[in-house]
Amino acid sequence: MMTAGITGGVGSGKSTVARALEARGFRRLDSDWIVREQVLADPAVMAALRARYGDAVVKTDTAGEPVAVDRPALAERVFSDDAERLWLEDITHPRVFAAWRAAFAAEPGARWAVEVPLLFEKALENWFDFTVCVACAPAKQLARLEQRGLSRALARQRISKQLPLTRKIDLSDFVLWNEGSPAFLEAQVDRLADALVAA
């Protein structure tokens, strides 16, 4: 088994690179998807969120039972308060790690590309054989986040919660620059895939 942790700034193109590696035969894990579709759907997690924030964050059915997390409302709370963000990470991260372990155990011979936004912030390097940083200029990051519907202020707030991109670049085994054409990025992914397969 070989594992590569794909990180970078928010809006840098981690998912694009991970999907490109998937197209080249790697198995892909998207940590944000795991949080969104599995962890936040866990009844125990919804109960903890409801106990802390009430119905402002957890949607309920007509019987008052929790059915879904209002992710924008949750994001507004945790990205504006470091203590709340750390509390949420304490709940979600162990469940994400459990999902990684289960996936790795199910396909122990696979090559894995795992999207991990906070790879270095949370000192998760030891989970992976290699680390890959997908990078672009800050102006490009902001533009991409605004295209997703975030205001410039919220986009800057989310970027500020991560390590500076220069630090992620310094810590990574491989760096891909995602600011040119799709073909430019694909060529870099080709070289990366060859290097990971040969390692």
How should these model regions be labeled?
Residues 1-65, 197-199:
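Glycine-rich phosphate-binding loop of ATP-dependent small-molecule kinases
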Residues 20, 24, 46-50, 97, ...:
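An amphipathic alpha-helix signature
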Residues 97-106, 111-147:
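ATP-dependent NMP and nucleoside kinases share a basic, alpha-helical "lid"
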Residues 99, 108, 126-127, 147-199:
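Small-molecule kinase domains that catalyze NTP-dependent phosphoryl transfer to phosphate-bearing small molecules
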Residues 27, 33, 130, 173-174:
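Well-ordered beta-strand positions
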Residues 13, 32, 88, 113, ...:
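Residue-level signal for inorganic ion chemistry
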Residues 36-110:
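ATP-dependent small-molecule kinase phosphotransfer cores
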Residues 33-36, 136-139, 160-161, 182:
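Short, acidic/turn-prone active-site loops that include or flank metal/cofactor-
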